[in-house]
């Protein structure tokens, strides 16, 4: 099935754009949602995380204590790699399962770290980047998540640069101050193009 990898920095508007594609009938497979699901109460990853990091990283409801884990992986690169060694294979398994059950004309994989992964570009037919300037990202995430500016800057610094994402892009949606109607029009135009690609793609 024809596939699009949708990516962008934190706060760029990936969820809004993916929801617009979903409303037009594309199958959406969101790796962030899968990551949350496997670390939710009694999620697939939780027994492995508890064994690797200890019970102090498991919240009372059986989910991942995200604040505690975030603090650890920002201060300890090896901890981040240990966490990813647990979560990434499970996320890949789930994305493949969801894509295999897809009913739309094409599938959109929402992958925040698509460029950073080093593997996703080869797994999709097109890369679509939702782009905005860094100050816009920071302001949006501070407002949405209640994070301090320093926290958001640290997250942005760990992600691929804007230039690196744009270099990987086949298609770009600029979302600095775009209205929902403007975004919807851009998505609708891309949707028509992707339907054409999907129809021409070998099964």
Curated annotation (Swiss-Prot):
Q: Which domain of life is it from?
A: Bacteria
- Which parts of the sequence bind ATP? 11-16
Kindly tell me the pathway this chain contributes to: Cofactor biosynthesis; coenzyme A biosynthesis; CoA from (R)-pantothenate: step 5/5
Question: What GO CC annotations are associated with the protein?
Answer: cytoplasm
Q: Name one GO molecular function term.
A: ATP binding
Q: Which reaction is the catalytic activity of this chain?
A: 3'-dephospho-CoA + ATP = ADP + CoA + H(+)
Concerning InterPro entries, the annotation shows:
Depp_CoAkinase, P-loop_NTPase
Instruction: Give start and end of each DPCK domain.
Output: 3-201
Under Enzyme Commission nomenclature, its number is: 2.7.1.24
> Keyword Protein biosynthesis, does the record have it?
no
Report the subcellular localization: Cytoplasm
Query: What SUPFAM superfamilies would the database entry show?
Result: P-loop containing nucleoside triphosphate hydrolases
Keywords, comma-separated and alphabetical: ATP-binding, Coenzyme A biosynthesis, Cytoplasm, Kinase, Nucleotide-binding, Transferase
Which BP terms does GO give this entry? coenzyme A biosynthetic process
Which EC main class describes this enzyme? transferase
Family named by the database record: Belongs to the CoaE family.
Q: Show the HAMAP family listed in the entry.
A: Dephospho_CoA_kinase
Name of this chain's protein: Dephospho-CoA kinase
